Amino acid sequence: YLYGIKSERRLVEEIRLNIAYRWFCGFELDDAIPDHSTFSKTRTRKWQQSGLFQNAFYEIVKQCIACGLIDGKAMAADGSYIPANVSRESWVDVETEVEQSMQSYLDALDEELSQQPGFKKPPERTIKKRRTTSRTDPDSGYINHGNKRGIGYLMEATVDCKHGILTGVDVYPANEKESLLVLRHLEQQIKLGVPMNQLALDRGYDTGAVHRGLELLGVTGYIPAIQFPNAPEKYGFSYNPQRDAFICPEGVGLTYHRLNCNQSTGKYLRCYQIEDDACKHCVKRPSCFDKAGIRRRVLASSCYPAFFRGHQRVGTPEFLSMMRLRKIWAEGSFSVLKREHCISKIRKRGILAATEECLLAAMAMTIPFRCAPRHQNG
């Protein structure tokens, strides 16, 4: 992975011909080189399920932290689609049974939601769900988003913007949603001692749960705002963070009432409503809601206060600076990984093998920073 060697067969050939590789591996000039199957069988039988590659990667990250190469002052995280090594003819729709429950982003966030008025955990039930995968690599998933279309895997990675060093790598089927995965991806790094103060994400992560989850993790998030088509502001409502209330065009406050749960999706929304009879004689009542309604309500994200605080940072000098760093380091790191370190496509099959490939590529990208000579003052 350091030198772009894509297979065990080619690796064995390089060791056979390259004196430097022979010296590094401890082989004499006349020693026989082991067969390529020795490498592949050892990797799959002994190392793949041992957590060795994950532990080795985090050990390198810890050494970089100790050397001052990672400070966590500015970081960026993103997901990248990597195609699987499958043919179009192997695509197949499969029907699986999945347990449907509340959307879970982070344990601390779930605990906070459970304390809110109106919280009611939806009953867990098993539903049948169809998904597209491949007969040759059933762990992979199908994505059809923008210019990304195909069977593959999603690599979620975090990079420190001081030197562009990767601090976390996780791999999922491509059909998984990035915003549902990122908080646990970040939490795992924080538990391992990775410093994380400010984090830049793209607009795909602009959900109230992600904004609040970052606050619970002690991270200041910078996320571009999505222009939602039915936002309360579109109808003249404004949010007052001091009161945690929406103000209608007539100046009447809609206070937080309770959580509403969508039973089919497991998603929670905050219900804001007018508590008295102010709507009954309002001149704008006919245009505000239908005759069956008693008082005006507004449904917003279950973590709307944090969502609002995150949007207040949009457009600030700090926000613009973090967006520039995200474009340079997050997108740039993915480009280097795919171009120089053999993961433009996942060559092996199965999510364990895909994780192994991404971790080895990340280590190959990080090791040169750790080995580079530095001055005594760091």
Feature names for model-found ranges:
Residues 4-17, 26-378:
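Anion-binding and metal-coordination hotspots
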